[in-house]
Amino acid sequence: MAFPLPRGITPPEISFLAEMEMVTILPRQRLEGLELLGGPVEPLLPPRRASLPLWLALLLKRQRRANILPPPWLHPESLSLILEIETQHHEYQHAFSPPPPLPGQPSLRDRGKRPVAMPRYTPDGGRYYPAPPFLPQNVAQDHVPSGEPPSLPFHWLEVGTMLLDAASDDLVDPDQTRRLLKELREVRTAKIRSGVDVLDAASTGGGGVALTGVGAMEVGEGRGFIAGVVDGLRKIGASKEQARREQMAEDMANGGYDATQDDDDDMEF
């Protein structure tokens, strides 16, 4: 008997998409330019840095033809600060640390300014707005703006795990980095599960779960759990509504039904 297909995108598929994230490498050998589906890749000339898709960077790393430079957020200091924001800041007690700003979106230090999203254009003139994994959220930076807090990109868990598995010797203190990533995942998973408590009110229009800053893998892993809870609450609400209608019909049949009761209920709702 075949099992039903999982809802939404699966974790292996999310990891596959994350391999298109651009990372920074330091080539150890010369390599001619490549023509890929995502666009051309410039020739690799040591010791000049280059930005490549993660899957190609991992391939060159396994062949010992390049070293991968970790993104700024994958340093122990940055992860420790993000973990502190997630656990100790009252503002983010039930929320997630702010994600990196999108193109045209003001950063935290420029909060209050009007966002101006700048579109990009395809070779045939089509307009589009880039989004992960097509944003430079995982490339190395020589200079990080002062006052700009570190933030986790959309594919933080997948990129961090793959870099720890294949390029741990290129990371700063990989053991501590792995521990901090594990703690961050546990803290954020607990927030997602605790947010399910408000879904009962959300099913009746009373609230919802804020998912701003949630990563791709977290969405994929929590989709089945949250969808199951919502379906269960919907069934419970339907049974309550059916029982209420049956009670109304019985009261009307007995002549004891008061129409003003529904008006009061609607006003309270």
UniProtKB/Swiss-Prot annotation:
Keyword annotations from UniProtKB, A to Z: Chromosome partition, DNA replication, Nucleus
Chain spans, region Disordered: 92-112, 241-269
GO biological process: chromosome segregation; DNA replication; double-strand break repair via break-induced replication
Residues annotated as signal peptide: none
Cross-referenced InterPro entries: GINS_A, GINS_bundle-like_dom_sf, GINS_Psf2, PSF2_N
Domain of life: Eukaryota
Listed GO CC annotations: GINS complex
Compartments in which it is found: Nucleus
UniProt keyword Nucleus present: yes
Ranges of compositional bias, category Acidic residues: 260-269
Pfam families: PSF2_N, Sld5
Subunit: Component of the GINS complex which is a heterotetramer of sld5, psf1, psf2 and psf3.
Function (record text): The GINS complex plays an essential role in the initiation of DNA replication. Has a role in chromosome segregation.
Family named by the database record: Belongs to the GINS2/PSF2 family.
Protein name according to UniProt: DNA replication complex GINS protein psf2
Naturally occurring in which organism (per UniProt): Aspergillus oryzae (strain ATCC 42149 / RIB 40) (Yellow koji mold)
Gene behind the chain: psf2
